[in-house]
Design a protein with these regions (language model features):
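PP2C/PPM-type serine/threonine phosphatase catalytic domain
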Residues: 1-215
Length: 215
């Protein structure tokens, strides 16, 4: 499968936060049609800890994945997981010994000969949007609200403004214990048509729009 990319677009805004904890790889100034790896991380941990965690994880993952292309052009889950291990190693190196460990969400797509590999952890999302059809693929948040939805404890209309809406159940975080690594959900997308758009965004974006607005 040959996939051509139009000029990617990227932007970030601090919004109401004191710090900009979102990190894009490549940066908005560096992204080109030659890129095949796109990463969004939303850090957490207070002060500048979240900012450092998101930058560290995204840079390590993106740099490794770009430097180690799949031999036959088709990326597999184990190949992506190898890059993820590099990101965890990089996070471990920023450990300051503080009791509160910084962490980050992850939304990543890798365009390859077999389609698009989509990986996410936490509540940063990946959307695949198709002209005339709207959203045809959307990642499922690793969050308390989604767990409550799945168990039937709350209804969909209660989810958007739920008081625990910012509680996530998985993230990449600083740890030297490999048994505690949290792994992302990885989806291999092969149903791709001309002019499909892949969008990576944080909760600060999708919290303000509905899927119909993305069509």
């Amino acid at each position: 499968m040959k996939i051509s990319i139009l000029q990617p677009k990227a932007f970030k805004e601090k919004g109401r936060r004191d710090n900009q904890e979102d990190f894009l790889w490549p940066s908005p100034e560096q992204v080109t049609v030659a890129n095949r790896v796109f990463i969004l991380c939303d850090g957490m941990g207070g002060h500048d800890n979240g900012e450092v965690a998101s930058c560290t994880a995204a840079t390590a993952l993106g740099t490794y994945r770009t430097a180690h292309p799949a031999p036959d052009g088709v990326l597999t889950k184990p190949m992506f997981e190898a890059a993820l291990a590099v990101a965890y190693d990089a996070l471990d190196k920023i450990d300051t010994g503080a009791s509160k460990k910084p962490g980050t969400t992850l939304a990543c797509i890798v365009v390859h000969r077999g389609g698009v590999l989509a990986a996410h952890i936490g509540d940063s999302r990946i959307y695949q949007i198709r002209k005339g059809e709207g959203v045809v693929f959307q990642t499922k948040d690793h969050s308390l609200v989604n767990d409550l939805l799945d168990s039937g404890e709350i209804k969909p209309e209660e989810a958007k403004n739920h008081p625990k809406g910012n509680v996530i159940t998985k993230c990449l975080f600083v740890t030297d214990d490999k048994d505690r690594y949290m792994t992302p959900t990885i989806t291999l997308i092969r149903d791709i048509k001309p002019h499909d758009v892949f969008m990576l965004c944080t909760d600060g974006v999708y919290g303000m729009v509905d899927n119909d607005d993305l069509a």
